[in-house]
């Protein structure tokens, strides 16, 4: 008899994520603004988490790259160059995304001011991210099991494809909705005059204006990548169902904290957070089901 699983964990885990997100969307549809009034309050620790919290999610890119690398190398030397190329690309992706989303804070940390400071300081800020991700491929190389190279390759490919698709779908939906952010609304004399629920969409109003890119939450797309952690746990040398469940619990806690912080820091409403999580989770479910065997 087969034990049906999704993303290396029992289906009940997927049902739990989907149920919580739907409940959040329903509650947010009625009380989005009131929830933000009650919870939104910028703090230093919230700002720190907003800057560096995505680091853990982006670690998944070089980890996925190492999955593919180790699987291809196991298949033979003829794949070694391809493996190295993919590993470098995935490492670069983590560094690029981190620098793109949070680089301004790091450059500020190093005292860089565009047009005034030495360009060398900007290079150092890139090096900061390069160093932060350096441990990932080395550790993953040691702990991943290459006895089934096809599973390794498909696991890494699923995470990469799902991550890239999620990011682009999210960017497209932000333009479709063009929903004003709470942090923008509270700068107005009458915040409710421009408040819109998630279904009250005004396509392409946002343009390049980030103040109108509240729905769905892009940061929750990043955070929800952590739900693929059990997929990586499932290719460990000493893997077990218990470890997969532990990874799922860790991912869930991370996503909840991240989601709360997005509201707390005035960036999103509850429905934005839940939609960002749900959309990303569905994409990862679909891609992993297409790439990886879901029965064992």
Residue ranges and their predicted role:
Residues 2-18, 196-296:
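Membrane-embedded catalytic cores of phosphoryl/pyrophosphoryl-handling enzymes
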């Amino acid at each position: 008899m087969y034990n049906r699983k999704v993303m290396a964990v029992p289906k009940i885990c997927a049902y739990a994520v989907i149920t919580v997100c739907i409940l959040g969307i329903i509650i947010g549809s009625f009380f989005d603004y009131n929830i933000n009034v009650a919870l939104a309050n910028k703090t230093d620790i919230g700002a720190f988490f907003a800057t560096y919290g995505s680091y853990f999610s982006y670690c998944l890119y070089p980890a996925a790259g190492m999955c593919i690398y180790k699987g291809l190398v196991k298949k033979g030397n003829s794949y070694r160059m391809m493996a190295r190329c993919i590993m470098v690309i995935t490492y670069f992706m983590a560094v690029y995304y981190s620098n793109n989303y949070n680089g301004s804070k790091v450059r500020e940390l190093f005292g860089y001011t565009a047009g005034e400071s030495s360009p060398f300081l900007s290079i150092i800020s890139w090096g900061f991210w390069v160093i932060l991700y350096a441990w990932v491929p080395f550790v993953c190389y040691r702990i991943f099991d290459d006895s089934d190279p096809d599973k390794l390759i498909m696991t890494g490919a699923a995470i990469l494809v799902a991550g890239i698709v999620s990011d682009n779908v999210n960017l497209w939906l932000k333009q479709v909705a063009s929903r004003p952010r709470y942090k923008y609304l509270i700068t107005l004399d009458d915040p409710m005059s421009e408040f819109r629920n998630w279904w009250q969409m005004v396509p392409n109003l946002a343009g390049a204006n980030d103040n109108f890119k509240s729905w769905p939450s892009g940061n929750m797309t990043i955070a929800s990548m952590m739900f693929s952690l059990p997929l990586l746990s499932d290719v460990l040398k000493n893997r077990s169902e218990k470890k997969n469940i532990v990874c799922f619990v860790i991912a869930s806690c991370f996503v909840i904290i991240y989601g709360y912080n997005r509201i707390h820091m005035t960036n999103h409403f509850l429905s934005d957070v839940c939609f960002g999580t749900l959309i990303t989770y569905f994409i990862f479910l679909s891609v992993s089901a297409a790439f990886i065997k879901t029965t064992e």
